[in-house]
Amino acid sequence: MKYSATIKTRDVDFLVPIPLETKIKADIPKLLKDLGFIINFKGSEGYIRLEHPNLIVEFLVPEKGPGSDKPYKLPHFGLNAQPLRFLDLLIEDTMKVKIEGIEINLPHPANFAVHKLIIFQRRTKEEKIIKDRNAAIEILRALIDKGEVAAIRRVFNSMIPKWQKKVIKGLEETKERGILSILTV
């Protein structure tokens, strides 16, 4: 499958499951400093972001409860993470992919696309709204073309009703009646 620019990014986000079940300790900022990364801080509370001319690395955790604008400390890794809503959706169904000898876990494309349908509605910058919305629709169409309608339905049906309403609202905004009809059967 060939991806268009709507899916490309120079951001790499690492989603850390909570609770973190590891005994491994690694000072990630120190390790990446040798590769030319610098530590930058984002937001009023100082989320750590590792920046390189070609890449930005951020760490995220699923936000639970009433929410907070404070970073979530990850002392095992020498950094902190930004808590964000709806990230549980990305952890629920992952797939292992090997890229240049490195094995990574990625969210299933259906989970990723449905997540984008929810978050584009929360964005404030028009550029990010368009990018997230287009990525969601493009991925969902590709999944439909590949005959993976059941995967899209599975993700949608696994969500709480409040999240389902957000997905439906997003599809209504995009006027994607075909995709909407798949979910509301």
Name what the model sees in each region.
Residues 1-185:
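Compositionally biased terminal segments of proteins
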